[in-house]
Amino acid sequence: MFLEAAAVMKPFIGTYENKVDRKGRVSVPAKFRAVLQAAEYTTIVVRPDRERGCIEGYGMDRLERLSEATPDLLDEGTQTPSLERIYDILSDSEELPFDPTGRVVVPADLLAQAGIGETAVFVGLGRVFQIWNPTALEASRGRKPRASASQGAGA
């Protein structure tokens, strides 16, 4: 099943803005759900991206590939930066199941780390996607936040 799912997994593309409720529930974009459901996944996997200040998301196939690619070097006492990164990804990842309406409950600590409040922006990046605070996303792209940009346009 893993190899078949990895072979047919389509890329996550597009940018979508969705509301987050007080319980941390957010609707995963229908196009992202379709990619995952085509590979027979009923969950997303998320982890904090501390370098960018967002949440990274993907299908379970990514964790399976990382796990299979991880050499058993700890027993040999060998530790490399790439191996440490793989272990960080594996240990930071959380699996979030879809509810019947396509929502997931994002843990409060992940939302806080990414500065996400009432609105989240999903950004497709091929094999992975990111979940951003809208203002932080605009800033990371070198743009003024939408509210500021529209205020500045009239001046």
Curated annotation (Swiss-Prot):
Q: Name one GO biological process term.
A: negative regulation of DNA-templated transcription initiation
Q: What does UniProt give as GO cellular component?
A: cytoplasm; nucleoid
Q: Where in the cell is it found?
A: Cytoplasm, Nucleoid
Please give the superkingdom of this protein's source.
Bacteria
What keywords does the record list, in alphabetical order? Cytoplasm, DNA-binding, Repeat, Transcription, Transcription regulation
Name any one GO molecular function. Answer: DNA-binding transcription factor activity
Q: Which residues form the SpoVT-AbrB domain?
A: 15-62, 93-136
Q: Mind telling me which InterPro entries this protein's record contains? A: MraZ, MraZ_C, MraZ_dom, MraZ_N, MraZ_sf, SpoVT-AbrB_dom, SpoVT-AbrB_sf
Pfam family for this entry, one: MraZ
Q: What is its main location?
A: cytoplasm
Family that this chain belongs to: Belongs to the MraZ family.
Per UniProt, subunit arrangement is: Forms oligomers.
State the HAMAP family in the record: MraZ
UniProt-recorded name of the protein = Transcriptional regulator MraZ
Species name for this entry?
Rhodospirillum rubrum (strain ATCC 11170 / ATH 1.1.1 / DSM 467 / LMG 4362 / NCIMB 8255 / S1)
Query: What lineage is on file?
Result: Bacteria, Pseudomonadati, Pseudomonadota, Alphaproteobacteria, Rhodospirillales
